[in-house]
């Protein structure tokens, strides 16, 4: 089974989209549609419905690894694998999916520490113009090293980041004082600042201080940029554990 899951669409404090895969070695024959939408581990952990604008696709994968490697996807412009799907014995059932969630939503502002806990080096005071340039939209002529001239353009990034929405995706470059387009900046008590490591821990749904093991702040930020939003594997694990309990009782 696989789902492409945006953590924020299930109430978590970060907009982070990743593929989550669950597999069994010796599973009984599945009802593919039921497995995808109802009985599957991921369907129970993260409910979905099919996006009605697109059809559900069925196709088969060649069982011979050599043939599959050389022939799969030839002539296909868009991947046959969609947002969610199941596969068993080479048979694939997949679709574009819409999340089903009606619970509470956590946002960036929920994870901020008090301003008194923020070290002075996290406040932005001297190089504000650099931050404004990098965060802003732009369309400008640039010249490559080989002399080729081109127009570089990009849209603006929220500056500061909205506190009433889940954070953007945390990247490995979140640490360090230098201005950056991708780092988060929040406004607190009228002052702009970067996120501290304890906040990054919590945006990945680790306990506050999880990475406070003696590492530098930059290394802590790097670790969180490489992490998953842990609420997702936790919910998948809860379903797996419940199934294991049922199997043992039988």
For the regions a protein language model found, what residue spans apply to each?
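Class I S-adenosyl-L-methionine
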Residues: 1-162
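C-terminal target-recognition/interaction regions appended to catalytic cores
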Residues: 89-250
């Amino acid at each position: 089974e696989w789902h492409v899951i945006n953590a924020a669409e299930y109430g978590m404090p970060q907009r982070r989209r990743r593929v989550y895969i669950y597999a069994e070695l010796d599973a009984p024959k599945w009802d593919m549609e039921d497995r995808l939408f109802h009985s599957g581990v991921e369907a129970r952990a993260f409910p979905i419905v099919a996006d009605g604008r697109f059809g559900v696709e069925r196709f088969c994968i060649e069982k011979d690894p050599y043939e599959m490697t050389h022939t799969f996807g030839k002539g296909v412009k868009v991947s046959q694998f969609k947002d969610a799907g199941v596969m068993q014995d080479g048979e694939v059932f997949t679709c574009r999916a819409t999340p089903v969630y009606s619970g509470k939503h956590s946002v960036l502002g929920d994870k901020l520490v008090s301003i008194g806990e923020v070290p002075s080096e996290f406040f932005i005071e001297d190089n504000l113009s650099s931050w404004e340039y990098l965060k802003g939209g732009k369309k400008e002529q640039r010249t490559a090293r080989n002399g080729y001239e081109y127009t570089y353009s990009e849209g603006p990034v929220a500056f500061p980041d909205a506190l009433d929405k889940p954070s953007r995706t945390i990247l490995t470059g979140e640490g360090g004082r230098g201005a950056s387009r991708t780092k988060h900046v929040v406004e607190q008590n009228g002052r702009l600042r970067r996120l501290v490591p304890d906040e990054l821990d919590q945006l990945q749904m680790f306990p506050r201080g999880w990475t406070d093991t003696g590492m530098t702040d930059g290394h802590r930020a790097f670790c969180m940029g490489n992490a998953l939003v842990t609420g997702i594997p936790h919910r998948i694990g809860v379903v797996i554990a419940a199934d294991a309990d049922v199997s043992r009782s039988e």
